Amino acid sequence: MPSAVQLAEKNHEKDSKFAKALHGESYKQTGLKALMSKARDASEVANDGYFKHWDGGVTKEDEDKRLSDYSNLTAHYYNLVTDFYEYGWGSSFHFSRYYTGEAFRQATARHEHFLAHKMQINENMKVLDVGCGVGGPAREICRFTDCSIVGLNNNDYQIERANHYARKYKLDDKLSFVKGDFMQMDFEAESFDAVYAIEATVHAPVLEGVYSEIYKVLKPGGVFGVYEWVMTDKYDDENEEHRKIAYGIEVGDGIPKMYKREVAEKALKSVGFEIEYEADLADKEDDIPWYYPLSGEWKYVQTLSDYFTIFRTSKVGRTITTEAVGLMEKLGLAPKGSKQVTNALEDAAVNLVEGGRQKLFTPMMLYVCRKPANEDI
């Protein structure tokens, strides 16, 4: 890990103009229809801006470049993949545990409810969602607890979509979504009762950086809950196969660097948090593995509607989508580079599954932490 990371320059006006040029009004659409509405020139800029970091770059110098350009790397990634995520997965961009008889959407909601329950979020709280995506978890947690939530996101397109959905589902009195870099938040200190992050802070170049910002905006005695993406204690960075899996996850998921579990734990403690609960929810020996939607194992499908979801997310479904997008690209219906994006997502899926099977990776290392009520103690 570099001793220091250069924070990104804040230029919200420039980012907003680029997002508008690229996406236009496509935030009102979904899936491949939204993809077809992108501006071709701006899409190429986003594509080049992302993939320049992954041209076989496995050296320490390549890694440091990705870490220093964390903000642009992540913003370009989500400019490219958001429509694919919603098409294949829905509006909650995270994994979940699965139980027998439980539908995919039900499992997704329960995973969000579990976090809110562990954090004891209630209707009197003002809550921050760090890396909120298009607002799926925020909407669900708002309905579950009746709390007020502010979603923080560095991607203008996702903010547009999140606010659009909040208005659509008449939750805009409780939900708001704002632009910001989670490594340098603009909120007043001690302004939130609770903060959560669901599979989002993995995009931070240094975990202490984002955790310290969360600590700063949290009120004394406030709670922070996070589902963190980490490599497990079984991961060996000197093992070529292990490193290949980690790199495949990084490339396909817009991550500057995957860190081990011990790094996340140390980072939380170093900024002042007291860890009240921790558990790797992927290491529970469940009958149905968390990665089954990507591995496409039909024996685990629990409901009729899930056959359609799992078909889209399975190897076969992903291949069909990739070839269809490639054809659309050739016909000029999709931006240049769209197939390259689906290939990267395929690389991510393969390595996420393999990392899960070998228990080298978890997307749900759960930490529930407390900011001391009296920091002088």
Curated annotation (Swiss-Prot):
This is Sterol 24-C-methyltransferase. It catalyses: zymosterol + S-adenosyl-L-methionine = fecosterol + S-adenosyl-L-homocysteine + H(+). Keywords: Lipid biosynthesis, Lipid metabolism, Methyltransferase, S-adenosyl-L-methionine, Steroid biosynthesis, Steroid metabolism, Sterol biosynthesis, Sterol metabolism, Transferase. One of its GO terms (biological process) is ergosterol biosynthetic process. It comes from Debaryomyces hansenii (strain ATCC 36239 / CBS 767 / BCRC 21394 / JCM 1990 / NBRC 0083 / IGC 2968) (Yeast). InterPro entries: Erg6_SMT_methyltransf, Methyltransf_11, MeTrfase_SMT, SAM-dependent_MTases_sf, Sterol_MeTrfase_C. Belongs to the class I-like SAM-binding methyltransferase superfamily. Erg6/SMT family. Its EC number is 2.1.1.41.
